[in-house]
Amino acid sequence: MGKKKKEKLSVAREIDGMEEKVALCKYNLDVIDVKLRKMELTEEGRKSLEKEKSSLSSRLSNYERELKSLRHENRKNMLLSVAIFLLFAVGYYCWTL
């Protein structure tokens, strides 16, 4: 079902959604960093937060990789649109001569 949902979204909307996920991950990482620096934690609590931080960091890395891929795909789509537009413009110009 995830693939069907992904296919229905435009690349721009996918980029927006991925940017939101990246922003949320960065915010959560900042919150965890503040907790690790400022709060007095037990060894177990510290390990738990560091494990969560590691998990969020890897998730953030995956999201950023996916975002880079989506931006590349968006760039290709834009170039294709420009090429089609130019083709029609040249065709129209030749037809009206």
UniProtKB/Swiss-Prot annotation:
Broad class of where this protein is predominantly found: membrane
Subcellular location: Membrane
Domain of life per record: Eukaryota
Coiled-coil ranges per UniProt: 36-80
Matching InterPro entries: CCDC-167
Cellular component, GO, one term: membrane
Transmembrane portions of the chain: 78-95
Keywords noted in UniProt: Coiled coil, Membrane, Transmembrane, Transmembrane helix
Keyword Transit peptide: no
Membrane topology of the entry: Single-pass membrane protein
Keyword set includes Coiled coil: yes
S-S pairs: none
PANTHER family: COILED-COIL DOMAIN-CONTAINING PROTEIN 167 (PTHR31759:SF1)
Protein name (record): Coiled-coil domain-containing protein 167
Organism: Xenopus tropicalis
